[in-house]
From Swiss-Prot:
The gene is MT-ND4L. PANTHER family: NADH-UBIQUINONE OXIDOREDUCTASE CHAIN 4L (PTHR11434:SF0), NADH-UBIQUINONE OXIDOREDUCTASE SUBUNIT ND4L (PTHR11434). The chain crosses the membrane at residues 1-21, 29-49, 58-78. GO terms for molecular function: NADH dehydrogenase (ubiquinone) activity. Keywords: Electron transport, Membrane, Mitochondrion, Mitochondrion inner membrane, NAD, Respiratory chain, Translocase, Transmembrane, Transmembrane helix, Transport, Ubiquinone. It catalyses: a ubiquinone + NADH + 5 H(+)(in) = a ubiquinol + NAD(+) + 4 H(+)(out). It is a multi-pass membrane protein. InterPro entries: NADH_UbQ_OxRdtase_chain4L/K, NUOK/Mnh_C1-like. Core subunit of the mitochondrial membrane respiratory chain NADH dehydrogenase (Complex I) which catalyzes electron transfer from NADH through the respiratory chain, using ubiquinone as an electron acceptor. Part of the enzyme membrane arm which is embedded in the lipid bilayer and involved in proton translocation. Its main location: mitochondrion. This is NADH-ubiquinone oxidoreductase chain 4L.
Length: 98
């Protein structure tokens, strides 16, 4: 496995560990989620370039579209929650309260 793939997988694992460790704030969870999506985007782009298959180039673009939608929804939830409750702690939120 080339070193570039190992670096990208390491960045995904570090973002995943950050998501698991720093899950108390919604903002830090969103940042770790964006780091995971960025590493997945770079990995899928490199795979599409190495496959030499024209239809494989659609996958990174579709992943980027879903990542942008996820970021927009996440930031909208962050603004809504911080305006309603005044903080962004994840453990204070419940499905029954929202």
């Amino acid at each position: 496995m080339p070193i570039i793939y190992m670096n990208i997988m390491l960045s995904f694992i570090i973002s995943l560990l950050g998501m698991l460790i720093y899950r108390s704030h919604l903002m830090s969870s969103l940042l770790c989620l964006e780091g995971m999506m960025l590493s997945l985007f770079i990995m899928s782009t490199l795979m599409a370039l190495n496959m030499h298959f024209p239809l494989a180039n659609i996958v990174p673009v579709a992943l980027l579209v879903f990542a942008a939608c996820e970021a927009a929804v996440g930031l909208a939830l962050l603004v809504s929650i911080s305006n309603t409750y005044g903080l962004d702690y994840v453990h204070n939120l419940s499905l029954l309260q929202c």
